[in-house]
C-alpha cells in the first residue's frame, strides 16, 4: 500500500502543477469564457458541440482540476490513515483538501460572475497553497526529512525569521504577479528595469501595477540572496537548510530572468508558463523550509529537556 501511496503522491503533485500551468494558459490565451458562463457544464452541455480552441483549453483545465480533486481527496484519506504518526500529516491533508475546494469554488465564481482580476489573482494564490501542501505531503510520504536528518535540525531565531518572512512576502509577490497577468499589464512597460526610455516613471494604472510587481520581485531576489549567504556561512552542517536556500536562489534567479524575457519576447506563451512554473516551485521549497522551522522549535525543546534530564 505504501508503494501505491508514493505513486499517488507523485501523480497528484504533477496533476496539481498541470492545473496551475493550465490556469496560466487559460489566462494567457483569453480562454476564461471558453465555456461561457456555464459551470460545471460547458456552454450548457456535458460535451460541448462547438469546440473552439478557447473551449478546448478551458474544458481541459476543468478536467485536470476535476481529476486533481479526486486524487487529492484519495491522497488525503490514505496519508491520514497510513502516515498519521508523522506530526504534520493531518494538517497538510486538511490544507490540501480545503484549499483545493476553495480553488474550485473561486474558479466557478470567476466563470459565473465574470473574470474580475482580483478574483482571478486570489484563485491562483489559493491554487498555490494547495499545490505546496500536496508537495509537502509527498515529501513526508517519501521520508525526505529522514534522509536529510531534519528531525535533529535546530535553527536560530534569525534564520527562522528569514524563512517565515520570505515565504509570506513571496506569497504577496505572487499576488502582484497574478494581478499583472489578469490586469493585462504584462507589456505595460516595454523596457527594463525602468518602465520606458522616454518616461522612466509609470503614469497610468497598468504601468503602476507592472512597476509595483518589479520592485516587489527585486526585493525578494535580494532577500533570498541574503538568506542564502547566511545559510552558506552558518548551516553547512545542516544540508537541508543549506541546499534549501541555494535551490531557492536558483529558482528566484530563473524566475527573474524569465520575467525579464516576458517583456522582451512580447509576453510569449512559453515565458509566461515558465514564469508560473518557477514561482510555484519556489513557493513549495520555501514552504518546506517553513515546515522545518516549526520542527526546529520542537527539536530545541526536546534537546533542552534531554539536557536537563542528563544533568
UniProtKB/Swiss-Prot annotation:
Extracellular side of membrane: 28-62, 113-121, 181-211, 265-271
Catalytic activity: Fe(II)-heme o + 2 A + H2O = Fe(II)-heme a + 2 AH2
Cofactor(s) the protein requires to work: heme b
Subcellular location: Cell membrane
Residues annotated as transmembrane: 7-27, 63-83, 92-112, 122-142, 160-180, 212-232, 244-264, 272-292
Any one of the GO BP annotations: heme A biosynthetic process
One Pfam family, short name: COX15-CtaA
Keyword tags: Cell membrane, Disulfide bond, Heme biosynthesis, Iron, Membrane, Metal-binding, Oxidoreductase, Transmembrane, Transmembrane helix
Pathway(s) the chain acts in: Porphyrin-containing compound metabolism; heme A biosynthesis; heme A from heme O: step 1/1
Chain sites annotated for binding heme o: 61, 123
Enzyme Commission numbers on file: 1.17.99.9
Comment block on domains: The N-half (TM1-TM4) and C-half (TM5-TM8) domains are connected by an intracellular loop. Each domain is formed from four-helix bundles and they align in a pseudo twofold symmetry manner. The N-half domain is the substrate-heme O binding domain and the C-half domain is the cofactor heme B binding domain. The cysteines of disulfide bond Cys-35 and Cys-42 may be involved in transfer of reducing equivalents from quinol in the membrane to the active site of the enzyme.
Quaternary structure and interacting proteins, as annotated: Interacts with CtaB.
Stated name of the protein: Heme A synthase
Naturally occurring in which organism (per UniProt): Bacillus cereus (strain AH820)
Gene transcribed to yield this protein: ctaA
Amino acid at each position: 500500500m505504501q508503494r501505491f501511496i508514493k505513486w499517488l503522491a507523485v501523480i497528484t503533485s504533477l496533476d496539481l502543477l498541470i492545473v496551475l500551468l493550465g490556469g496560466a494558459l487559460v489566462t494567457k490565451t483569453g480562454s476564461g469564457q471558453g465555456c461561457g458562463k456555464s459551470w460545471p457544464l460547458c456552454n450548457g452541455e456535458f460535451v460541448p458541440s462547438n469546440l473552439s480552441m478557447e473551449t478546448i483549453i478551458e474544458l481541459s483545465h476543468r478536467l485536470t482540476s476535476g481529476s486533481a480533486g479526486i486524487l487529492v481527496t484519495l491522497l488525503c484519506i490514505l496519508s491520514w490513515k497510513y502516515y498519521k504518526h508523522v506530526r504534520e500529516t493531518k494538517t497538510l491533508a486538511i490544507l490540501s483538501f480545503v484549499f483545493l475546494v476553495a480553488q474550485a469554488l473561486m474558479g466557478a465564481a470567476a466563470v459565473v460572475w465574470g473574470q474580475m482580476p482580483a478574483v482571478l489573482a486570489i484563485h491562483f494564490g489559493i491554487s498555490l497553497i494547495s499545490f505546496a501542501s500536496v508537495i509537502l505531503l509527498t515529501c513526508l510520504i517519501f521520508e525526505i526529512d529522514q534522509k536529510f536528518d531534519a528531525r535533529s535540525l535546530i535553527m536560530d531565531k534569525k534564520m527562522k525569521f528569514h524563512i517565515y518572512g520570505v515565504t509570506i512576502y513571496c506569497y504577496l509577490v505572487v499576488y502582484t504577479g497574478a494581478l499583472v497577468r489578469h490586469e493585462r499589464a504584462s507589456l505595460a512597460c516595454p523596457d527594463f528595469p525602468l518602465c520606458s526610455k522616454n518616461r522612466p516613471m509609470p503614469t497610468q494604472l497598468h504601468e503602476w501595477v507592472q512597476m509595483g510587481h518589479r520592485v516587489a520581485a527585486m526585493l525578494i531576489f535580494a532577500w533570498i540572496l541574503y538568506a542564502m549567504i547566511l545559510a552558506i556561512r552558518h548551516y553547512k552542517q545542516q544540508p537541508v537548510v543549506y541546499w534549501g536556500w541555494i535551490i531557492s536562489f536558483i529558482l528566484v534567479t530563473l524566475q527573474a530572468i524569465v520575467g525579464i524575457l516576458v517583456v522582451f519576447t512580447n509576453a510569449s506563451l512559453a515565458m509566461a508558463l515558465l514564469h508560473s512554473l518557477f514561482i510555484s516551485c519556489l513557493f513549495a521549497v520555501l514552504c518546506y523550509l517553513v515546515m522545518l522551522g516549526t520542527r526546529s522549535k520542537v527539536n530545541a525543546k526536546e534537546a533542552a529537556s534531554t539536557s536537563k534530564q542528563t544533568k
